[in-house]
A protein has these predicted regions:
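Helix-to-loop junctions at the C-terminal end of transmembrane segments
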Residues: 66-78
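C-terminal ends and interior cores of transmembrane alpha-helices
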Residues: 88-117
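Cytoplasmic helix-loop-helix junction between adjacent transmembrane helices
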Residues: 127-167
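Flexible cytoplasmic inter-helical loops of multi-pass small-molecule transporters
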Residues: 212-245
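Extracytoplasmic
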Residues: 15-49
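Residue-level signature of mid-helix packing/kink "hotspots" within the transmembrane helices
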Residues: 32, 60-68, 136, 170-171
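Helix-loop-helix hairpin linking two adjacent transmembrane segments in secondary transporters
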Residues: 162-213
Length: 245
């Protein structure tokens, strides 16, 4: 690369690393918030520990499966769109979860006791399992983006820095939801979903603006040695990858 191209590549590389770090941290905002809201849901809604534990178990199982499924899908799609849309959908699932009491009350009528409680628990369970699946849209596109933008010889070092996004996201949501529950009391559990969801939805918009799928998307050459700089056509001849936006 010439000096100008190298500067542009460095800029986009840094931008991609920072954007994906922030984005992946926000996936934790709309997953780890559940545990912090649990005491409030027990007190305010009367949901049992058994139901809440079942939500967590199913969420974890579906999340594990979804990482495999989403990994396959992310390899075949634009990683920029995949990550941004996935985070936005996680945020919407959290918004819906926070409105579960209102949804069940509106559909079945307020104050009807057991039926409303069952409907609310079912709605919450569906939303949290759905969120578990959508959480799997976080890491696979990051892995794809980073391997396109970081040379193999730098990958271990820069991935070590990137991996702090897990701890940053989990730590910040503890502070945020801890403050919310301390300030609003048991009834503040809803805001443990609404506020992280609002932040994450805004973050999804930032991801869509900040990320680009590959270096060729911005007129830069692919990194040598990754195999991405060439592809085979029908005649098995090597040619440069076409530019993608």
């Amino acid at each position: 690369m010439d000096q100008d191209t190298s500067k542009r590549f460095k800029y986009w590389q840094t931008r991609t690393i920072i954007a994906t770090m922030v984005g992946y941290a926000l996936f934790y905002f709309v997953r780890k918030n559940f545990s912090l809201a649990m005491p409030g849901m027990e007190t305010d809604l009367g949901i049992t520990k058994t139901s809440l534990g079942l939500f967590l178990t199913l969420n974890g199982l579906v999340y594990g499966l979804s990482r495999f499924v989403n990994g396959i899908l992310a390899d075949r799609m634009n990683a920029r769109y995949y990550m941004a849309i996935g985070l936005a959908l996680c945020a919407l699932a959290n918004f819906a979860f926070g409105f579960a009491e209102s949804v069940s009350g509106t559909l079945l009528g307020w104050g009807i006791g057991k039926n409303q409680m069952q409907a609310m628990i079912l709605f919450m369970g569906v939303m949290w399992v759905l969120n578990g699946f959508l959480q799997g849209t976080g890491f696979p596109p990051c892995a794809r983006l980073l391997t396109h933008w970081i040379p193999p010889k730098e990958l271990a070092t820069k991935m070590s820095v990137w991996n702090t996004s897990h701890s940053i996201g989990a730590g910040l949501v503890v502070i945020l939801c801890g403050y919310i529950m301390g300030h609003y009391g048991a009834g503040g559990w809803k805001y443990c979903f609404f506020i992280p969801a609002a932040i994450s939805f805004a973050g999804a918009i930032v991801l869509f603006i900040a990320l680009r799928d590959t270096p060729t998307s911005v007129g830069l050459p692919e990194i040598p040695g990754t195999g991405a700089e060439y592809k085979k056509d029908g005649k098995k001849k090597l040619r440069l990858r076409t530019k993608r936006f």
